[in-house]
Amino acid sequence: MARVFVDTNVLFPFSLMDLMLALTEDAVHTLVWSDHLLAEWERVIVRERQRSAPAAAGISAAIREFFADSRVPDDDYKHLLAQMEGPDPDDCHHMAAAVAGRVRVLVTWNLADFPAAFLARYGVTVADPDAYLCSLLSRSPREVLGVLRRMAAGKRRPPMTTIDLVGALDRAGVTLFARSARDRLDGLSV
């Protein structure tokens, strides 16, 4: 099972965050995270007025509780920070945590700030969420489609079909993944 670390920008919109976490719940991949990542996510989500500070803190607390096994403690990567290459100190934290967390893929919309050749020396590939999810769907179609079905079945406000959920992911920016998932679901009972 692949270990992945996501940049903060992958954790919203919530449909994309939910998918990344659900893939971990169903053991399709392991989402590795750090306290720094969640703190940055809270700051951004509150600044963008998508959640209140207490609501964002509650979501982070739930991630800490339910995904505790995939946390990379600061002490495991702080010694790597000075070695990381990149213009943004927050991104250097993410790169160092990814290296210490032995991830295979660092997923980000901001490919320019994560030097692929540098991270490859540590065995880490950099991919955007659409490319990563397409690759995962190609390698594990039954599992990924199962996650989408389970997620849709759990949606209550508003209720969603699997196709509705795929549409939300399409609007979240993972258009190639959404198209591929829709094609695979075509003709199936969703």
Give residue spans per PLM region.
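Acidic, PIN/NYN-like endoribonuclease modules and their adjacent C-terminal/linker elements
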Residues: 112-190
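Acidic, metal-coordinating catalytic cores used for nucleic-acid/nucleotide bond scission
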Residues: 10-11, 79-90, 112-115
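PIN/NYN-family metal-dependent endoribonuclease catalytic core
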Residues: 14-49
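Acidic, metal-binding active-site segment of PIN/NYN-like and related structure-specific nucleases
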Residues: 91-125
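Short, surface-exposed acidic-centric catalytic microdomains
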Residues: 35-73
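Short, basic, glycine/proline-bearing loop/turn elements
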Residues: 68-84
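Metal-dependent nucleic-acid phosphoesterase active-site entry motif
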Residues: 1-18
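Amphipathic coiled-coil/heptad-repeat helices and related helical stalk/stem segments
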Residues: 16, 90-91
